[in-house]
Regions:
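Predominantly the C-terminal beta-signal and adjacent terminal strand-loop region
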Residues: 115-168
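Transmembrane beta-strands of outer-membrane beta-barrel proteins
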Residues: 28-34, 74-76, 88-94, 129-131, ...
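Early exported N-terminus immediately downstream of N-terminal targeting peptides
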Residues: 25-49
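Short loop/turn motifs that connect adjacent beta-strands in outer-membrane beta-barrel proteins
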Residues: 21-29, 84-87
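Transmembrane beta-strands of outer-membrane beta-barrel pores
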Residues: 20, 34-42, 96-102, 137-139, ...
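Detector for outer-membrane/organellar transmembrane beta-barrel domains
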Residues: 62-101
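Extracellular/periplasm-exposed beta-strand and loop segments of Gram-negative cell-envelope proteins
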Residues: 1-7, 41-71, 99-110, 114-130
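Surface-exposed strand-loop-strand hairpins of Gram-negative outer-membrane beta-barrel proteins
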Residues: 1-15, 150-152
């Protein structure tokens, strides 16, 4: 029932604190950061997520223009990089997200009406792996999160993956 429209979904990660250790001689380094991550999963516009006790259920709606499931987290990425970070480098690592908020938002055709549901039963800890190809201050990355987004038995089995562009 959770029909995610992948190419309309958006993820934004902002690392507020960042630290790096790098060996010029061995061309290897380690990066760690702390920041915020915002995931906005676009779902079918004729569905709204609602809680039935602790269970997340889809409900059919009419007149929906856009329906989203949003997760806001404290984001802690860690990567080991090989190569020259000022030119070309490759990094692999992982991340840990501590979920602060989750909600469902529906925007209807008549623009002014919105419906919100906060506090969906998501797992507090979410973790994943990252691979990144960096060209100076620009990078192409992919992430996969094998941990479930919803608590066991409270929603659909759902992992996320992301392909994106990074700056700095």
């Amino acid at each position: 029932f959770f029909d995610i429209q992948n190419w309309h979904s958006v993820q934004l990660s902002l690392n507020i604190l960042h630290s790096s250790i790098y060996s010029q001689k061995n061309k290897i380094g380690f990066n760690v950061g702390v920041g915020a991550r915002f995931n906005n999963y676009r779902i079918s516009p004729d569905i709204m997520l609602k809680k039935d006790g602790e269970l997340v259920m889809p409900y059919a709606i009419e007149g929906g223009k856009r329906s989203n499931f949003c997760v806001t987290s404290l984001h802690i990425p860690m990567e080991v990089l090989v190569g020259n970070p000022d030119r070309i480098s490759f990094a692999v690592g992982g991340y840990l997200d501590l979920v602060a908020d989750s909600r469902s938002v529906v925007k209807y055709e008549e623009r002014k009406k919105r419906e919100h549901l906060k506090g969906l039963p998501t797992n507090f800890l979410q973790a994943g792996v990252t691979a990144r190809l960096k060209f100076g201050d620009f990078s192409i990355f992919a992430t996969y999160q094998p941990t479930q987004i919803f608590k066991t038995g409270c929603g659909p089995n759902m992992q996320s993956w992301t392909i994106g562009l990074g700056l700095f």
